[in-house]
Each structure stands twice: as structure tokens, then as C-alpha cells.
Amino acid sequence: MKILASSTNYVLHNRLSNSQYEDARSKIVNFGGEFTNDAAKADYIFVNYSQINRVRRELRTIGTPLETCVSCKLIVKIDWLNEPKESLTPGNPYVIWHRKPEMKVGSPYTPSTRPASHTEAPNDFENHETPNTENNNEVKSIDNVDQEGSVYPTTKEYPYVLEIPRYACQRKTPLKCVNQAFVNALSVLKTCREVNGESVRTRAYGMAIATIKAFPLPIDSAEQLEKMPGCGPKIVHLWKEFASTGTLKEAEEFQKDPASKILLLFYNIFGVGASHAAEWYQKGWRTIEQVRKHKDSFTKQIKVGLEFYEDFCKTVTIEEATEIYETIVSRMPDGIKIQSCLVGGFRRGKPVGADVDMVLSPSHTHSTKHLVDVLLRILDEEFQFRLISVQEHSCGGKKGYVMLAVILSNSSKINRRVDIIVVPPAYIGSAVLGWSGGIFFLRDLKLYANSHLGLSYDSFEIINLKTGKDICPDEFNEWKDPVEAEKDIFRYFSLEYIEPKFRNTG
């Protein structure tokens, strides 16, 4: 059945698992259609939504507003692919939007004045992963709006602001931004959601923060903010409150709340998550000492977190981190050649951090396991240290390792957490990139690689989803400087190289 013959089709990845996404792509091809990774070129766009206003928003967030999809004839619920009995016409019940004959197809998305009567879609911020089914009567008028104006400002200095990129891996995100005061207030609310175990809301706040930090101009209107990826009505409402009062009431209440202070105290223990913090609070525990009385029942990581709690609360300076890193790499035996790099927040320009992360890779003449053994000897000779764990990872048939140790710093005499990542030569670029962060930069890099390139990326492998093969041994097998190896990954992904200091998404 070639019911999609001669059509070009796009699948909106949002709210689809990787397997569902790949299944949809396969069905499109089986039905005679062509698949494209560019929504702007598609005749049909398949989505896992039932409301067009949600689709409009998601298309905007990936940097392809519906107005730019000049080829699109229909937007179709993805369920149609399971039983395509009826042809795709505007009257099909699976079609949630069609291009009206009288609609003028314009040129690519350009700034214009937003209609004064336009009302934003219902707030989906508090329930980010499920469709909003409330206020259906209210959104019907929005469903019939064929064109929306853009309010993105654009300047010669910041041309990308015209359509701020959907993916954080395409944006420059500094450590401090021009809207930092608002970001700080939102970060308190993100922490509030995080310590209460609200992962969806935590992620939603994080997405908004990552976008706002990348915006290079002061936000001076709600209309300006609401067009940014991840900044829905909730964030706009908070901005209005902050713009008028200079603070956020909920953030202030969280910081003053006695229960929240205790939950945050527990949550900040190394190895402890939101569920443990809540459980301990429900048991009536209120101090670290009360928790320590029950340490025998905890995991190894939590025991370490409790034992070194006071030291782990003291931040590491970049000078101390560099000293620890240089001590380790300088003690390498002459016969072992390595490429290495200090990663984590310090590579992004943070002056202080919670731990010390580094990536090391031996030349082709030595195995990663041999390097791990050498590193253990160096740690034993140069520091008082305790090995917490050594995790093994597959790297295209070879082995990669993550060593977690607690060492007593020679300069500060404070116990520090140290992560040492050891990878084969072909994987130093992916490891340096993956361990340099920030969280939402990497999250969006993975989404971009998956949806646009058909690749599954992490620090230890890059898998071609069609073949199931790790591409690193073939594409990146040259042993080279970590920065150059990292740049190779960006080039392979067809992305502009973003310097680490501009990956501070949080």
C-alpha cells in the first residue's frame, strides 16, 4: 500500500520514544513516502498531539514555526500510521490542521507586529509531557489562526535572535548573562522542584533558564519572552511578576520555609536523591547527625557522602582543581603517552566547583586498563585517597572507565571528589564533549543527534541507529589533542563549534 506515494513527510519527535519515532519513520517509507528531517520541506507533518496550538508551540521551539513550513498541506496525528484506512484529506479525523486554499503562503519567518487579540495557548508548563485538555473552548479560536507574527528582535551583532535556535547545542550560553537576576530567581524555583522530586517541572524550568541565558539582549517585554524555546505562559507570568517586583514570591517562600531547608540539606549530601531526602524528613530526621546514626543501611555512595559531608560542602577553586589535575598527569611514566583535559564546570569557566573531573586517553600502544592501573599507583603515591568505584563502559569493543575517588588535597588538606574518565583514542572527543556539560547543552545535543542525524550519542559511543554500529572507531580513530578531537564531533554533527565557556546552560 503506497498511500503516501510522492509525498515528503516529517515526524515531530516530541512526546515520542526513540522506538516510536523510528517505527513511524519505517511506516512512512513502507507506505511509499519520503522522509525528511526538515519540517519546512514536508508535505505532511506527523505529531503525537491532538491540539494544533501545542503543535505550533513545538514547531517554534525546534526553530521551524508553522509559518515557515510552506510545503505543509496537513498535520496528522501519528496514530493514523497504525491504521491508514482513509486517505489523508482535510476531512480525515486524524488531520488536526490543513492549509486553507485562501491562505497566502509567505516568505520565510520574518518579524512583524503580533496581533493584539492573540491569546497564548493554555499553560502546559506544569505538565510538560502530557497534552493539555483543559479550556478546550478557549483554544478553539487559536486553532483557526493561520499565521502568527514573530516578535524576535534581530540585530547585526546577534542575527540568530531572529529565530533563536531550538537546541541549546546551537546557542552560545555564557556563565553570566544580561538577564542574570531573573535567571537566579528561576533557578531557585528549579531547585524547589528538584528537591521535591518533580522531575518534569525541574526539566521545564531548566529548559527556560537555558534559553534565557543564551538570549543576548535584556528582556523588556512579555511578547519578546514568550517566543523563546521553552518559555511558555508560566515563565511569562513569572517574568511579569519579577519585572514589577524585582523578586518571585514563591522563590522567597521556598528559601524561608523550614521544611524546604531540611530537604535541601539532605538533598545536597553526595549520593542522595529527592526520594531519600523526603523519606528521611518523614521519619522525623532533621540533622546530618541524625542521618548518620542510620548509615549502616545506606548505599556505599551515601555512606561516603555522609563521611565527607563537611569537606564536600566546601567548594574547590579552579586553582586547586588544576593543581590536582597537573599532579596526576605530570607523574605519568615516560613510557606512557597520554592526551588529557580538565573538564566539568572548570572547563566552562566556573571559578569554583563541587568536584574535579578529568579525561585521559592513552596512545594506541597502551590499553585503557593499563592506564587505569597506572593511575591507581599515582594516586596511591601522591595522595591520601580512597577509591570509591571503577565503572566499566563499552567503547566499540574496547573499554572505557570512570574512576571515582576521594583524595586529600595536598594544598587545602580538604577531601575532594575526583572523577577520572579513561577512554581509547577514538573516544576522547566524545568523552571531553560529554564531560564538559552543561546539562541542557548535552541533553539537546543528544536530541539533535537523534532526530536530525539518526545517531545516539553519549560520552562513550556514538551509535548509528540504522546500523546499530558505533561510528567512533571509523570516524575518529586518530589520537589527537582533546580540543581538536572535540571539534571533530561538532564537524561530524554539522554544528558550529561552541566554546566550552558558552555551554553554561545549567
UniProtKB/Swiss-Prot annotation:
Superkingdom field: Eukaryota
Top enzyme category: transferase
UniProt cross-references to SMART domains, sorted A to Z: POLXc
Catalytic activity: DNA(n) + a 2'-deoxyribonucleoside 5'-triphosphate = DNA(n+1) + diphosphate
Disordered: region residues: 106-150
Compartments it resides in: Cytoplasm; Nucleus
Region (Involved in ssDNA binding): 348-357
One biological process term in Gene Ontology: gap filling involved in double-strand break repair via nonhomologous end joining
Family that this chain belongs to: Belongs to the DNA polymerase type-X family.
PANTHER family: DNA POLYMERASE TYPE-X FAMILY MEMBER, DNA POLYMERASE TYPE-X FAMILY PROTEIN POL4
Name this protein carries in UniProt: DNA polymerase type-X family protein pol4
Species name: Schizosaccharomyces pombe (strain 972 / ATCC 24843) (Fission yeast)
Lineage: Eukaryota, Fungi, Dikarya, Ascomycota, Taphrinomycotina
Gene that encodes the chain: pol4
